[in-house]
Each structure stands twice: as C-alpha cells, then as structure tokens.
Amino acid sequence: MKYKDLRDFIQRLEALGELRRVTQPVSPVLEMTELCDRVLRAGGPALLFNAPPGNAFPVLGNLFGTPRRVALGMGVDAGDDAALGSLRDLGRLLSALKEPDPPKSLKDAGKLLSLAKAVWDMAPKSVSSPPCQEIVWEGADVDLNKLPIQTCWPGDAGPLVTWGLTVTRGPNKSRQNLGIYRQQLIGRNKLIMRWLAHRGGALDFREFALQNPGKPYPVAVVLGADPATTLGAVTPVPDSLSEYQFAGLLRGSRTELAKCLTPGVDTLQVPARAEIVLEGFIHPQEGAPAPAPAGAPPRPAGNAAAAYEHALEGPYGDHTGYYNEQEWFPVFTVERITMRRDAIYHSTYTGKPPDEPAVLGVALNEVFVPLLQKQFTEITDFYLPPEGCSYRMAIVQMKKSYAGHAKRVMFGVWSFLRQFMYTKFIVVVDEDVNIRDWKEVIWAITTRVDPVRDTVMVDSTPIDYLDFASPVAGLGSKMGLDATNKWPGETSREWGRPIEMDAAVKARVDRLWQEIGL
C-alpha cells in the first residue's frame, strides 16, 4: 500500500494496530523520550501524543520503531521477516540503478529500458496551493518555541529538532539534496544545523560559500513528510538519482513538490503535503564573532563557510549512548514557517541502542546486502549489529577463494559506500558461520584467528566525530579481523576440521526423538 502523506500512513498504522493515541498529558521535556524508549524496547506501536500542555501541536513518535513499520513506510505490508526480504529487493533495485549490468540479450535490454523509464516517470512534479502552505507564520509570528520540540535527555543543551528533512542545493546543481541533521534550538527563529563535513548539506553549503562569498545560503527544513520521502532521505540513493525521485519509485507515484515562499529560498522545493516547513538562510557573520568560551574548541577558520554565522552546538545524548562533545556548526535563521491546518510535529530521540535510528539501521542493513554483492560477488551476507551503533562494526560472511581474500574484502567494504567510512571494526567469516548469532561469530574469532597474523590495523582514517574514543576528533584507526579458515600460504599447520555428526545417525535419532517423547 502506498501513502500520499504522513496522515495517510498514520491512518493505516492505526487500522493495523501499529499506532496508539496517547490522550494523557505527556511533556516533550524528557517524558516523551522515556515513554517512547520503553515502547520501542517492547516492540510496541507508534505513538501519537495529544498536543502537550501549553502547545497546539500533536507529536508523532516511535514511527519507525519496528522493521515492519519501516517496510510499511516503503509500501510493503508484511511481517518482520517478510519485510526484511522485501528490503533486499529494494537493495537490488538500488544496485541496478547505481551500476546497471550491460545487457546480454534483447530481453535484458528491454528490462534495462523499463527500469530507466520507471525512473524517468517518477520525476517529481510541481503543484500550486499546496496543503503545506495552508497556514503561514512570518515576521514577528515566527517562533519556534510554539512547536513541541523535544528535550530528550537530562544533560542536553536544550530542545532538539530530530526528524527534520533538510533541503539544500549546491551551486549549478539541478538536484536537490535531502538530509537529516539534528538542530539545536537557540532562539525563537534560530537553530544550529549540525551537519558533518562529508554530508550532502555541508558539501552544498561549502560549494555555495566558495562561489558566492557574503551571500545568504537558502535552506528549508521539512517536518512530517510522507514515509517514502522520509525513508528516501536515509537510504543510500545513487548520486544520479534525487531522493524525491526515489521516493516516487517507493510510493509508485510522482512526488508532489511546492516552491518555498520566502524570496531567495524559493529556489528550493518541499513535499507539498508536508506537515510543517521551516524556510530561511544561513547568513554571513556580521562583524567580528565573539571569542570562543573558555574550554570550548576554536571557532572554524580557513575556509569560505567559516565566514558564516556559527554557534557552539551540544552537548547532546546521541546514538552511542553518551553525551557528545561541543562543536561549532552553522546557524540556520528561520524567516518563515508554513504548515497544514492541524499540523502534526514528527519527532524522535537517539540514545544507547536500541533506538529508532538503530531499527532503521537493521532495515537498511538489508538494503546494503545486494549493493555490496553487486560489487563483491564473494560476499554472501552482511550484518551491522545494532549494538555497534548500526555502523561502527560490520560482520561479513564470504565465500573464500584464495589466501588473503578476506583482507581484500575488508578494504573493499571500507571504501565502497560513504556509509562505511566510519565503520571501525570489520570481522570476516566463512559461509558456515551465522553472522547474526554472536555465539557463532565469537566461536569463529576464538578458533580461527591468530591476533598477529589475522588482525589488520589502519591508522589515521576518517572516524565519526561523535566517537570520543578516537585520539583526534574525526580521525582514528580501524581494525579488521580475518576469522576465516586459513588457506595454504596463510598457515603452515594442518587446519582443523569442524566436527559434524553422521547424517544417517541424525536421521535415526530424529525418529527416536518422537518415540521417546522428547
């Protein structure tokens, strides 16, 4: 089933028993986090909170708290296991879009043309008088404090926008970028845009600042998009395909877009049926910036983007289960807020796994498998454990063909997708090891690994800025473990043979099992 907007999805979830309305008063300050966290850990439903005390907007939480709801958002109505299989089908679609196979026959050529036509047919379309602009706040009416922005953890620096789809465009680019970056509230119309240097929004901003020094950079933030658009923003979409176009493929209908209303921001388009849209700019710094507070990291310098207004962001509790360090990021000044009548505020929290991003990670793991297999046919399975923050550790199952093969796969995974540049640990095992069973993985490590021979250490590599274990912010080491059976050339010893029971004996005991009544 496909959903034209968030409300359509909410209605479907409620009919399936996958959404619960909470009528009791619940505060966005800490209480929503605690309630959503308990429900998520129990595998419970999405929660639609009545407008909290002193606020006019209901809050939607825990929307993608199970793999099934992620699959439902992508248009697949199935149980968790079947849903994960459907996500692999999605990965195969993405791998075909990323790197199409040369046709070997007229039939193959026809399939390739059909795929290209499907993508072309899903180009977004512009509409006028969109629902997302039914109500408009501008001038003195712009006040982000009127929104029920969550404060997630006791040590957080303040309220935090968590599910905002940030829309940007680089200079001379027709394709808009959608990214999800947390945004700290620091004033009635100001948010800190925490995008890391390698993310699409930050790259667009830096390119703009280089080519247009001193000019405000337009940004839009969408709160409460339809599920296909939201999930498109977190999926590894090929650079040649826009997230809006990919959302159309998921939905089976073209994404309807509306131009923003603010002059200068009207170069950007947002989902026409979004609940709330923030429009504004990142402005150049006026005058000399105030000195950094004592003990804070130095202000950014040395590039064109550093000449824009920045503020010290954090600390915040994040997906690692810790509070992160403070860092400087650009300030987004909101000049206009548009919304639907009776708008719904979509929110989440991040914390020690499992949390909603970890559940999304489990789902996206299935999307990654066909993408990796297209490039590395020897990979038979791939797993990003949620306990490893869904990206910091990868377990790879492979069909080994020669000595040193596992090490080749390690470096291949690290370099293949941007999503894996922050993966600190890779463990490679053979096909006989179930990589989703820690008992089997630990057995393989402890019986097939010699620490000196089978450990690969790589220093001075890109590392997540939130990883305080690295000696330098953003730069650290990686480790690979070759837990495969060793081939000639890798060992001079006779390699162990796994113990297996005789098949005839197992069949005999199967029959006895029933007779004995065990």
Swiss-Prot record:
Family under the similarity heading: Belongs to the UbiD family.
GO cellular component terms given for this protein: cytosol; plasma membrane
Location of the protein in the cell: Cell membrane
Source organism phylogeny: Bacteria, Pseudomonadati, Pseudomonadota, Betaproteobacteria, Burkholderiales
Cofactor: prenylated FMN; Mn(2+)
Annotated prenylated FMN binding sites: I180, Y181, R182, R194, W195, L196, R199, G200
Pathway per the UniProt entry: Cofactor biosynthesis; ubiquinone biosynthesis
Residues the record marks as active site: D318 (proton donor)
Enzyme category, top tier: lyase
Organism: Burkholderia orbicola (strain AU 1054)
UniProt remark on cofactor binding: Binds 1 prenylated FMN per subunit.
InterPro entries cross-referenced by the UniProt entry: UbiD, UbiD-like_C, UbiD-like_N, UbiD_bacteria, UbiD_Rift_dom
GO biological process, one term: ubiquinone biosynthetic process
Top-level taxon of the source organism: Bacteria
Functional note: Catalyzes the decarboxylation of 3-octaprenyl-4-hydroxy benzoate to 2-octaprenylphenol, an intermediate step in ubiquinone biosynthesis.
Binding of Mn(2+), residues: N177, E243
GO molecular function (one): metal ion binding
Entry EC no(s): 4.1.1.98
Residues spanning the signal sequence: none
Swiss-Prot/TrEMBL keywords: Cell membrane, Decarboxylase, Flavoprotein, FMN, Lyase, Manganese, Membrane, Metal-binding, Ubiquinone biosynthesis
Name of encoding gene: ubiD
Protein name (record): 3-octaprenyl-4-hydroxybenzoate carboxy-lyase
Entry keyword annotation includes Protein biosynthesis: no
Principal location class: membrane
Membrane topology field: Peripheral membrane protein
Assembly description: Homohexamer.
Listed PANTHER family: 3-OCTAPRENYL-4-HYDROXYBENZOATE CARBOXY-LYASE-RELATED, FERULIC ACID DECARBOXYLASE 1
